[in-house]
Amino acid sequence: MLFTASLLLLLPWASAAPANLPIVDLGYQRHQAISFNSTGQYYSFTNIRYAEPPLGSRRFAPPVAPHGRSKNIVNGTGLGYKCPQALACWFNVQNKFTSAAAAGTPFDFNAAYEEVYTKDACTEPAKQDPLQSEDCLFLDVYVPQDVWQKGPQAAHQKGGAPVLVYLQDGAYVGGSKSDQNPAGLIARSREEGSSGMIYVGINYRLGVFGWLSGRKFTSSGGKPNAGLLDQRLALEWIQRHIHLFGGDPSRVTVMGVSAGGGSIIMQMTAYGRGISPPFAQVITQSPAWEPGTKTPAIEDDLFDTFLASLNVTSLDQARRLPSHALTDANYRLVASRPYGAGVLGPAIDGDFIPDSPKRLLLQGKANPGVRVLTSYTAAEGFGIAPANITDEASFQRYVGLMLAGTDASVRTHAATVLYPAVFDGSMPYRTQHDRASLLWADLAASCNTRYLHAAVRTPGYAIEYSVPPALHLSDTPSVFYNGPVADPTVNGTIAELLQRQIVRFVKTGNPNGEPDPEVPVYDGRDLLDLGDDGVLVRPDSTDNARCEYWQKVHF
């Protein structure tokens, strides 16, 4: 069986390396695989540079493709594996809340808050992670040996291996290309005599480095949505170079969860012109961003706070500071944000994002030929809506936070019509916290899958993941399942089914195959539910007036 050596599969670099690992000539450099995984039968090409270091004058600016020619052979060692990381402290409180809920034990919000913010001194940056660097615009390519041995395909020639590109989650402030181990997916792709698929993981700038925005920032020479521009350059790199690894540039699928899934939607609507994107298919899992949390004043305040924390008065001065100063300032800014608030992320900029991506999809400003597989979880918002929402006043404050960028009539409509204070079972909630959870799920994640399907003309497929606790991101361990030894808490039956569906979609554009339950072609009404109690077709919970309303709101 493919999963009998689960412990080795857990390490993508577990190596019984041949004496001469393969080398690929990218034009600007020659890059050698760092290892060969003898269990999974694939090569790992890690830390391939796809952009010049975003340092100095290139900070807060669009990425620049590599230029020149290096005479040396590189293998990716000694480089920054991840971009500077940060996490809002309130997420640590939420993790304690969801753990208590899962265990069925009481939760003391005030005690948890005190522990995180005071005892743990969460807002102060910890010692720098040696794998973290501003010079982080790299990608990893994992190539099955059978694919590599067939030789590189001629540029743009069809017939190469399918390619799965993964954009990580992390609320636009954390995460890296190395967070997930693709060994299980690669093994699944090699079943039934197939040569398998190529897997690519991408780093993109996070936090202040990738997502500052607003009038002051832009007028100072900053470029909003630099993180999206990084992703775009990496996807274009794949179109130009993946044939050198044996991949087919016309068979690229981009997959992402949460921030990664939200980014995919913005890549679909890039520039608002319906242009052909640098991929053929997408898999979006809980595609998330918070469209209503930004206002011009909030954007300017974030920028001012960032400069003040650096003790500078201009972006040019910030660009000249040492990296550790910027990294620490980024951490403090993100860590100290108000409870429940998304901090940094995509913003309407009149360029890459000319309008709300929700409305751009409604207006048909995405390429309709892209094939789509979507999913969301059954309890998306439970672990994200603040744990201290227990009464009408706290719910109203949350509405104000989530919809700060809208006018008062939208906030009133949300609180009285879409999510009224009715707890008799006639609404999909019975508590104030569940009411807030549904607001977040609809506004930030679940409904986005519906909008994406409606914007394309190709047959699409939709899944709901309801394996308990079915929280936001709880399907990720199933996607990257590596067998019962490596992942003993994962429902292996559901995980292997989900992996087969993903791999089939990557290969053929259709997730179905014998003997698995069929995922119906999405019609706006039904989808396939994956749960501990079975797999069945059921009504899509996004088929409601709430989702219809949020797509049309001006954020």
Curated annotation (Swiss-Prot):
One Pfam family linked to the record: COesterase
Biotechnology: Patulin was originally used as an antibiotic and specifically trialed to be used against the common cold, but it is no longer used for that purpose since it has been shown to induce immunological, neurological and gastrointestinal effects. Genotoxic effects of patulin with dose-dependent increase in DNA strand breaks in brain, liver and kidneys have been detected in mice. However, more recently, it has been proposed that patulin might also have anti-tumor properties.
Highest taxon of the lineage: Eukaryota
Binding site for substrate: 258
Gene Ontology annotations for the cellular component aspect, listed alphabetically: cytosol
Entry keywords, A to Z: Cytoplasm, Glycoprotein, Hydrolase, Signal
E.C. number(s) listed in UniProt: 3.1.1.1
Protein's UniProt name: Carboxylesterase patB
Pathway(s) the chain acts in: Mycotoxin biosynthesis; patulin biosynthesis
Function: Carboxylesterase; part of the gene cluster that mediates the biosynthesis of patulin, an acetate-derived tetraketide mycotoxin produced by several fungal species that shows antimicrobial properties against several bacteria. The function of patB in patulin synthesis has still to be characterized. The pathway begins with the synthesis of 6-methylsalicylic acid by the polyketide synthase (PKS) patK via condensation of acetate and malonate units.
Cleavable signal peptide: 1-16
Family: Belongs to the type-B carboxylesterase/lipase family.
InterPro entries noted in UniProt: AB_hydrolase_fold, CarbesteraseB, Carboxylesterase_B_AS, Carboxylesterase_B_CS, Type-B_Carboxylest/Lipase
UniProt-annotated catalytic positions: 258 (acyl-ester intermediate), 380 (charge relay system)
Recorded catalytic activity of this chain's protein: a carboxylic ester + H2O = an alcohol + a carboxylate + H(+)
Cellular localization per UniProt: Cytoplasm, Cytosol
Major location (coarse): cytoplasm
GO terms of molecular function: carboxylesterase activity
Presence of keyword Hydrolase: yes
Chloroplast among keywords: no
Residues of this chain annotated as glycosylated in UniProt: 37, 75, 311, 388, 491
